[in-house]
C-alpha cells in the first residue's frame, strides 16, 4: 500500500532521493521511508550547495526535502558553478522547516522548474497545509490549503472566525479529534487547544477567498510597542534584500517608554562595504512603513539557526531582557 501510494503521488515514476538534512527531523526522516517502496536514498553527511548539485547529477536524483536556508545557499552559487551541473532529473523538492521568502522561492522555481511542494506543519502533527509550485505562482507567499483531516481557521482574540484576508491566529480543526500532542507535556498540549481537535501551532496568518493560507508571523515573536502590534517578519523580508545582508532576525527589546521596540540583528556579507546601522534602518524605511521598521540595528556573527533553518528568538532576546522585570 505504501509503495502504491508513492507511485500514485509521483505519477508512476520514482527515483533516488537526496537526503540533505538531519534525520532526526520529520522531513528528511519521512523521505527515507520511501526505502520501503524500493526507492534508494543518497545521504549527505552535511549540506554543501555545490556538492548537492554534484549529487543530483551523479545519482540522477529524483526528489529531495529541503529548507529555505538550503535554497539561499544554492542561489548564492556563482552562475558558472550552477551551469556546470545537470539537474534535469529532479522531479520533486519538498520544503519545510521555516517560511520561505517569496523572491527566494521564485528564483528556485525559475532555476529548477515547478518541482517544489511546500509542506507546512509540525513534527507533532504532520503536514497541515500544502501547495504546489503552480498554485504558489498564483498565490505567492502562501503555504497552501489545509489537507485532510485538517480544516484551517483564522480566529480573533476571542476565538471568533475572521473573514477572508483578515489577519488573526491560525488554528486547525482536526476531523479525527486528535489535535496536536506534545510528548510528555500535557500542559503544553492543552494550551495549544481551544476545543477538542482545534489547535494552533502558534502562527499568525490570513486566508484568502480560495482558502490559501498566508503566514505572517508567530504569536511569540510579535512585538507590542506602545500598544501597537509589530510583526518582525515584515522588516526581515525587507532587510534580507539589502545587498550587504547575509541573514537577519528582528526581535523585541526593552524600551522605557514604549515597553519594547524592534531591533534588527544582521549578519553582514563578507567583502562588502558595510553601511552604518542608521543608514540600513533608513533604507528599510524607504520600503516599509516607518513604525514597522526596527529602531535599532546590531551587526552579529551568528543568529543560531539550527540545521532546519529555524531561529530560537527567545535565546536572541534573552540577553537584552536580562534584569528587566
What residues fall within each predicted segment?
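Adenylate-forming
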Residues: 1-5, 17, 30, 53-55, ...
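Beta-strand->loop->alpha-helix junctions that form or flank phosphate-binding loops
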Residues: 117-124, 144-145, 251-254, 298
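Active-site glycine-centered loops adjacent to acidic/histidine catalytic or metal-binding residues
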Residues: 97, 121, 144, 203, ...
